[in-house]
């Protein structure tokens, strides 16, 4: 199990930042094996599958981040606004990611990322590079609102 620390933004906002780390499986296959579940059980419990998918993607983003002198965080504030992953370089430049198992969640994830970006625009000195949604299926493309939709297969699978 690996900790994913909370991102420190130095935002001047009425919403307070949550500082606790999130925990993810470092090896999703071991988690599935220890649960003793197979393909059928995973297909019948999409909530569990979504949590496992998020851990898988975060593990891979962590590997890519380390290779590029960056770190992986999450964002969560007292208003309930949450971003699954913030990948930040030492220079302060960062990208924000939402991780969604299915393509049916893309619009809601994009709305969430755009809300996050609007808060940062007014209050944050760090430089946002891109807003991204990683999905388990579908095509990779850039939406009209400049949010990137990235299929898991584009990450090298």
Annotate each predicted stretch with a short phrase.
Residues 102-119:
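Mg2+/Mn2+-dependent nuclease catalytic core
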Residues 64-67, 115-127:
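Arginine/glycine-rich "motif VI" loop of SF2 helicases in the C-terminal RecA-like domain
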